From Swiss-Prot:
Residues 469-486, 542-566 form a coiled coil. Involved in the pathway that organizes the shaping and sizing of the prospore membrane (PSM) during sporulation. May be required for the formation of ADY3 and DON1-containing protein coats at the leading edge of the PSMs during meiosis II. Residues 67-86, 95-121, 486-499 have a biased composition (Polar residues). One of its GO terms (biological process) is ascospore wall assembly. Residues 23-37 have a biased composition (Basic residues). Phosphorylated. GO terms for cellular component: prospore membrane; prospore membrane leading edge. The gene is SSP1. This is Sporulation-specific protein 1.
Amino acid sequence: MRSSGTYENDPSGEITSTSPKQSKQKKPTKFRERMRRWLQNGKNNNHQGEEDVPEIFNKNFYPQTGMTAFNNNDNGEVQDVTNNFFLPSEDESGPVQSSVKTFLTGNNDEDSNFQQNQNPKQKSELPKSPYRQKPTQEIALLKDLFVTNKYDDPYLNSSTRFGNITSTFPSSLSLRTVTLQTIKKRIDCISAKKKEVWKTEEKFLKDILMWLQSSNFEDPDTISLIHEIEKIFEEDIHFEQNVSDCLKEISNNFEYICMRETQLINEGNILKNDLKKYAKAREHKGEKHEDTEVLREKVISSQKSFDVTKRHYKHAISITTRQLFMNLAFEYYENCSDMKDISRKYLQESLSTLQTIDTLSFSEELEKIRKRRFDKFWAKTNPDPTNNIQKFVNMRTGVAGFNDSLMNHLYGKLSFGVAPVEEELQNSQPEHTDVPENVWNEVLSDYNSMDGNPITSNKFLSAKELEPDQLVELLAQEKEEKEAKNISSSTAEVPSISQPEIKKENLESNDSLILRSTKRNVNVNAASLRNLSIKKTQVKPESASEESKVLAAALNDAKQNLDENVWRTPI
């Protein structure tokens, strides 16, 4: 039942005297009246055509089935008007319908008088931001942890201020408190897991050895494989045991550091309470009051105690904890080095066995290992492959090698041709042992394009002295080869003196082009002749035949003719 009091927007304007308790009872009645008008407006909008309603008003903002609103129509039937009202977002734009002009959105025209008649003091307290605000990204710090020093007391240290103490801690600590006791429990859990791992590995080795003994066949390859696997897991068991013991030692020594932390927390709480009492005394009693002076002295003593405890705590963290984890790092380094040696030996033996049994699988496994090692090598030396793309491609495809400890050990153990390291390619010089030893063979030339190029350099045409001993040795070898061929055939033996005579006639009768070609062959193969003379036994000049001396004289004559006529006729 409605009370006799008037509303603020009552048109009658009659003022009735009501008690304060009765005025407080008017608010729910006014709320029901607004709700009735709000639902009535939604009912009227429901009879409008869909053409008049913009697209943004056709969206369902209440996908849950339980969130519905009902209104009674003229016939008393219940009608669902859930989709007739909603709260539009800031990003959506469109004409504002009467269905959204409610007291919730602040666009109700009928209640504009009520908004105007509000107390201006209440209006000033309303937030000036829009209806929908984005939540702030930063989580507020725990302001109740320490009290700020509002008055900048010179007797108080800067460490007692709220910002300097809590700014070093992340904001996630406001959601969950993590202490060294929690970290100690985690270390104990890791140590227990490590212990469980090496115990499980011991069971695995026991089972696999029992399987090997109970098997009926005796295959040497299988037995060697089981023993190699046993070595790997034995080393890993030793590694896990050492790490588990080291973690247990760290956990035991953490008790001392946890005590320091607990003491620091207690001293911080005492200092926080003293700061609160001191701040209240300054506000209510003044700074010159005796109680304020006593509290200030208490704050100073609490501050000094807190600083001493904090100093000891920092020492325990920076020195004691560092020493404990240094022992753990040393254990990792030592055991990992032993694991690398055992693993390298296993890889060498396995690849050597695959090379003899299955060549295809051997090549695939070796290529996988090489690519994985190259990826690690390239990531350490050159993170960006665009710096040297050609070098990256050559190493990746195996054209060029790279300096890797594991691959060097594998290549040294395995007997097959592999891509050498770049340093080896530069230092090694291939020997032409299979090439026939012929004076006129230009393939044996050791001159590069800049020293012996007939187009770019005149040094190519310069005369070079040929030693008679080299010619004698060369002709003697040619004679031996021809004699070996003639023995197999039934043809008559040709006199050896005919060949030098034919060469002499050709040198004298041909034109300058042929002479230049002959000179080029002689000059180019000068270094090859020197290399060949080292490999062969030396022949004394006294044992040389008369035919060899005639050939040497013919070559000297040809050399002189070349020097005189080389530039007269163009090539």
